[in-house]
Curated annotation (Swiss-Prot):
Protein name: Holliday junction branch migration complex subunit RuvB
Pfam family, one: RuvB_C
Organism field: Pseudomonas paraeruginosa (strain DSM 24068 / PA7)
Region (Small ATPAse domain (RuvB-S)): 186-256
InterPro entries linked to this entry: AAA+_ATPase, AAA_lid_4, DNA_helicase_Holl-junc_RuvB, P-loop_NTPase, RuvB-like_N, RuvB_C, WH-like_DNA-bd_sf, WH_DNA-bd_sf
Residue positions binding Mg(2+): 70
Example GO BP: DNA repair
Annotated keywords: ATP-binding, Cytoplasm, DNA damage, DNA recombination, DNA repair, DNA-binding, Hydrolase, Nucleotide-binding
Chain positions covered by the region annotation Large ATPase domain (RuvB-L): 4-185
């Protein structure tokens, strides 16, 4: 049996991590590092909306996990000087769930819906008139006596976030006046983020130490901040507390994060494709079965960075590894990958 004080300690530790996460999140666009185009555009749109004393247009933010979609939604509310209410697509199971949120919004408020691509069709139908006309259609009664009434809503801003913009229905996508895509971060911006977070956490970190963490963070701020906290643990226990390049390198090697930012699962994915499927092509379902992982884990968590870095390609016949994957593991490159992938990979069959 677990002792009560251990349970209390575990909760406190989790709360501390959540508090740290909130502390290192920027609250203003001026503090939002990276994504220069998105930052400049949002600054313009927000300034214009505030000048007209209007709610900001509905905004869709999409991109791989961990790039700052939730952070940007909170910044929008902060910059507009309004409140934000947060929920997610899977939570809104019934129209009444959405109606309860909408009717509690004040003028100009932000409603943030994470994983908006997972909204049920029946909830989407309620959302359309709310977004377009700021009206809520509610059915009262049942059977022949049922009737529809319209409730006026205050102007509000819906901010939707998704890792899969392609899964949004056209009617929903078309109702967003602002659409922003977040890209993977470069090492310089990530190093700046790591240094900023270290300062907030009261850590001493050298420029090279921040750069070492940034190099292995897969272009993702969330991962960079997570690695920073683990390197901090290593520095406090096995070092002098300061984070140098050497300390960061030793800590990340202990965490099994290599120089490209690949962890055990990334390497397992690439080696499975090379060893079991001769480098591909392999369908996503076969790959998921071979790895004993969920399909969406591969598509949403692993693949985006590996594709962006040129280690995997999607073809009509399935996924294939590139020559970079063989070079990464010090393996001989197959002849077919000499000048490039042979053209027969790009014909017939669907690789999904």
């Amino acid at each position: 049996m677990i002792e009560p004080d251990r349970l209390i300690s575990a909760v406190s530790g989790r709360e501390r991590e959540e508090q740290l996460d909130r502390a290192i999140r920027p609250l203003k666009l001026a503090d939002y590092i990276g994504q220069p185009s998105v930052r400049e555009q949002m600054e313009l749109f927000i300034h214009a909306a505030r000048g007209r004393q209007e709610a900001l247009d509905h905004t869709l933010i999409f991109g791989p996990p961990g790039l700052g979609k939730t952070t940007l939604a909170n910044i929008i509310a902060q910059e507009m000087g309004v409140s934000i209410k947060s929920t997610s697509g899977p939570v809104l199971e019934r129209p009444g769930d959405l109606a309860a949120l909408l009717t509690n919004l004040e003028a100009g408020d932000v409603l943030f819906v994470d994983e908006i691509h997972r909204l049920s069709p029946i909830v989407e139908e309620v959302l359309y008139p709310a977004m377009e006309d700021f009206q809520l259609d509610i059915m009262i009664g049942e059977g022949p006596a049922a009737r529809s009434i319209k409730l006026d809503l205050p102007p509000f801003t819906l901010v939707g976030a998704t890792t899969r913009a392609g899964m949004l229905t056209n009617p929903l996508r078309d109702r967003f006046g602002i659409v922003q895509r977040l890209e993977f971060y470069n090492v310089e911006d990530l190093a700046t983020i790591v240094s900023r977070s270290a300062g907030i956490l009261g850590l001493q970190i050298e420029t090279q130490g921040a750069a070492e963490i940034a190099k292995r963070a897969r272009g993702t701020p969330r991962i960079a901040n997570r690695l920073l906290r683990r390197v901090r643990d290593f520095a406090e226990v096995r070092g002098q507390g300061d984070i140098t390049r050497v300390i960061a390198d030793k800590a990340l090697n202990l965490l099994d994060v290599d120089e490209r930012g690949f962890d055990h699962l990334d390497r397992r994915l690439l080696l499975t494709m090379i060893d079991k499927f001769d480098g591909g092509p392999v369908g996503i379902d076969n790959l998921a079965a071979a790895l004993s992982e969920e399909r969406h884990t591969i598509e949403d968590v692993l693949e985006p960075y590996l594709i962006q870095q040129g280690y995997i390609m999607r073809t009509p016949r399935g996924r294939v590894v590139t020559r970079h994957a063989y070079l990464h593991f010090g393996l001989n490159i197959p002849k077919r990958l000499g000048p490039g992938v042979t053209s027969d990979l790009f014909t017939s069959e669907d690789g999904n």
